[in-house]
Amino acid sequence: MKPQPLLLIAIALLCCCVTDEGDKITSLGKIADESIVYVWWSVKAEDRVYLGLGTVDGTSFAEFHPPNRLEILLSSEDFSQREAAVWDGEEILIFGGTVFENGKYSPTDQILSFNPKLERLRVLNASLPHPTSDVAAVWGDSRVYIFLNNSERCEVYAFYPSNESFAKLDVSCPIEHPGGCVHSVVWYGGKAYFFCGEGVASFDPMGGFKWIAFTDRVWVRAATVADGYIFAIGGSSGIAETKDEIIRFNPKTGELCEMRTKLPVARGQAVAVGGEYIYIFGGYTKDGYANEILRYDYRGDKCVNFIQLLNDDVKKYRPNNGKQ
């Protein structure tokens, strides 16, 4: 990648409140002044959010300052789709993805590192076990847990940034396509939680995966942690079947419920970060990719549809409509 000169563009985001009094979602305006914007990833670093953006001109790295300022830190003419990103406390690490080379798109085994303070982008000497775009990653226990597809079989690796080394874990991994969970995995309380595929699952580095609930097959949800809960937003069970639902999960009690508020437009492939509010960036809708930032007041919302877990092993779920 050959970065262009640094762009410092402060974008004022206009607040356009929704008209439904019962809705808790506010539109903060455009992500960028572009005809098409793809949001490849988001990571939270203390009080700031970093985003990987794709446009017709290439790739940009942006910094979002809640509540309403976005700044482009670095732009490149590189055309690539890299979505598996984590924050390691100092840098953003980005794993695999798809790159445009020699007139075609191909999977890559590259690991990129972006330092927002130094505005420096580099390719690490280490690389994934094989080129793939079917990959998800999460930061936990001072390492990166990487879930990738190897010949239709999910494998789990631990990556240690301090010495750029890998260790393959001897654990189960029932996720069919980790890349479909790339924005749907979060770390909380010593475990990774997945909200994709056949339902909700937890991953313990020592014990592997455990299904918590089986739901409809939904991919590309946006998941984030906020106030001790995990929220899963939108998703898709097919390109034409995007979701507008917001689901809240309590990892301490196992309570799973659907929130009253719906997305103003159904979408999958969005990214989300939690804090005082949950910020939702981009996503794919029936009208194409959404060039929009949404702010969700989750504390002002409430559950209207609790999902009743049937037994300790949890093989199915049953909506319990009307339970408050």
From Swiss-Prot:
Sequence ranges of the Kelch repeats: 229-276, 277-323
This protein's UniProt keywords: Kelch repeat, Repeat
Pfam family, any one: Kelch_1
UniProt keyword annotation of Repeat present: yes
Keyword Repeat listed: yes
Name listed for the protein in its UniProt record: Kelch domain-containing protein AF_2170
Originating organism: Archaeoglobus fulgidus (strain ATCC 49558 / DSM 4304 / JCM 9628 / NBRC 100126 / VC-16)
Organism classification: Archaea, Methanobacteriati, Methanobacteriota, Archaeoglobi, Archaeoglobales
